[in-house]
Amino acid sequence: FMMSGYFVGYFIGAATIPMIISQVGHIRVFAAFASLASLVILIHSIIISPFVWFLLRVLTGLSMVCIYTVAESWLNDRSSNKNRGSVLSIYMVILYGSLGIGMFFLNFSTPKNFQPFILVSVITSAALIPILLTKKKPPTFKSIKAMKLRELYNASPFGMVSSLFYGTIQSALFTLLAVYASSMNFSILELSLIHI
């Protein structure tokens, strides 16, 4: 139940982020939602309640989709047709590599302590520094027109269906793998390893 909140926020963010970016720009959106993510992470360590954590996960999902959208649209804008695939591939390797490596931090402190929450908040806050200090101009898009689901399906039926299946499988693994591993009495190290 709690982890599903992440994907509720993710869907809300995916529907609203283009409008927010068009109104205030990439840098402010990144700063605002990285700050929100950092704040929400710390609140997890203060309030222990399944309902509150569900709401915090909604805010985390919203924040992360906004951060991802800003990063990916910026990379997309800065790359050419010749190198776009390579640039986005490197980005995805770094993204998923970071998620996998992050799981090993569970081995250094118990989630019952404040330290893991503080560490994640510090890392999230540090992500603001290069974006806020960049001299590069953010992407500018003249107009953002959302595709309807029917248009998206007509443009790429295989892409849409495979993305739907991939998202469903990934979200199930992301939310339930730790629960399964815990029920099977996996150690923290084993749990970290299966998330790679």
PLM-predicted stretches and their roles:
Residues 194-196:
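Conserved small/polar residues in nucleotide/adenosyl-binding loops
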Residues 58-93:
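Cytoplasmic helix-loop-helix junction between adjacent transmembrane helices
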Residues 13-25:
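Helix-to-loop junctions at the C-terminal end of transmembrane segments
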Residues 121-141:
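C-terminal membrane-cytosol helix-exit motif in multi-pass small-molecule transporters
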Residues 28-42:
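Structural signature of the two symmetry-related core transmembrane helices
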Residues 7-11, 15, 99-100:
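Residue-level signature of mid-helix packing/kink "hotspots" within the transmembrane helices
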Residues 25, 46-48:
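Helix-breaking motifs and short loop linkers at transmembrane-helix boundaries and internal kinks
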Residues 51-59:
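Paired small-residue
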